[in-house]
Amino acid sequence: MFQGETAITLDDKGRMVVPVVYRDLIARMSANRLVLTYNPFEAGCLWLYVEKEWERVRDELMVKPNAHRVVRVLQQKLVGSSALLELDANGRISVPSSHRSAVAIEKKAVLLGMGDKFELWSEQAHHALIQQTLSDGDLGDGLLDLRL
């Protein structure tokens, strides 16, 4: 569905242009609506879902018993802190300042198409992740059976 890496520049109002290649698909899948939330696994990164996929993720998470602290924290970070965004006539979305500041996105960002969602990274965090991944040398046994 979504794939690829795109350098993004946010304007002074925190708006970013969604790449043209994705706009038609987003329009068809969710009437130009995206849901923005925090990535609980990586600092410096936000997740963007088309509305329908977000509803699946949200519903799956919200049926979990919140008596467990980790479930409650995930529900708060993912669902409680989510924001519904709509593409404007120029194909832009406005990233809330609270989300931008939490992941240190100022002007420069990187948008990654990750299949069922996008990851929106601060440029610095994305660069650091790439450097760390390349320098680790060992990506773990989980990739041994993957044909690349």
UniProtKB/Swiss-Prot annotation:
Residues 5-53, 82-125 form the SpoVT-AbrB domain. The keyword Repeat applies. Keywords: Cytoplasm, DNA-binding, Repeat, Transcription, Transcription regulation. Belongs to the MraZ family. GO terms for cellular component: cytoplasm; nucleoid. This is Transcriptional regulator MraZ. PANTHER family: TRANSCRIPTIONAL REGULATOR MRAZ. It is found in: Cytoplasm, Nucleoid. CDD domains: MraZ_C, MraZ_N. Signal peptide: none annotated. It comes from the Bacteria. GO terms for molecular function: DNA-binding transcription factor activity; transcription cis-regulatory region binding. Pfam families: MraZ. The keyword Repeat applies.
